[in-house]
C-alpha cells in the first residue's frame, strides 16, 4: 500500500546469518537489513546462542565455519523451543553432490553455492518470508 508508514524494525522478520567471512556477512547484512532485522554470527556456536535469545524467522548458514559447523548449528537450533521448523538457507563453497544432499536432508529450503548472485539470494529470502 503506497503511503503507508514503514514497518518499525522491531516488527520486521528476523534473519540470523552465520558466516565466518566478514565481507560476505557484511554484504548480506547490508542488503537484507533494508527489509528485515538481521543478526550476524561469525560461527555456529554464536548462531545457536543468538537463536536461543532472539528466535529467527530464517536461518542463513555457511556450512564450513570454525568450531560448530553450519549443519551442526542448524540441528542444534532446530532443537530449541519453537524453532523446529525454522527455514534454512545454506550458503557454502561445498558444492559436491553429497554435500548438497546432506544440506537438503538436514532440512534446508535452499542450498546455495558460493560464489552466488546476491539477487538470487534476496529472491529466495523474499519467497520464504513472503515479503
Predicted regions and their residues:
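C-terminal output helix
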Residues: 116-126
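Charged docking surfaces used in two-component/phosphorelay signaling
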Residues: 23-33
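Acidic, metal-coordinating helix/loop segments flanking the phosphotransfer/catalytic sites
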Residues: 40-58
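Receiver (REC) domain active-site loop signature in two-component systems and cognate sites
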Residues: 65
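Conserved acidic carboxylate
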Residues: 19
Amino acid at each position: 500500500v503506497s503511503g503507508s508508514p514503514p514497518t518499525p524494525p522491531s516488527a520486521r522478520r528476523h534473519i540470523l546469518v552465520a558466516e565466518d567471512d566478514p565481507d560476505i556477512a557484511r554484504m548480506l547484512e547490508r542488503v537484507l537489513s533494508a527489509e528485515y532485522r538481521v543478526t550476524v554470527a561469525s560461527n555456529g556456536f554464536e548462531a545457536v546462542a543468538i537463536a536461543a535469545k532472539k528466535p529467527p524467522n530464517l536461518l542463513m548458514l555457511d556450512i564450513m565455519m570454525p568450531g560448530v559447523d553450519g549443519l551442526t548449528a542448524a540441528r542444534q537450533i532446530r532443537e530449541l523451543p519453537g524453532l523446529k521448523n525454522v527455514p534454512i538457507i545454506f550458503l557454502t563453497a561445498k558444492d559436491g553432490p553429497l554435500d548438497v544432499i546432506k544440506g537438503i536432508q538436514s532440512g534446508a529450503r535452499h542450498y546455495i553455492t558460493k560464489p552466488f548472485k546476491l539477487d538470487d539470494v534476496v529472491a529466495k529470502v523474499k519467497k520464504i518470508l513472503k515479503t
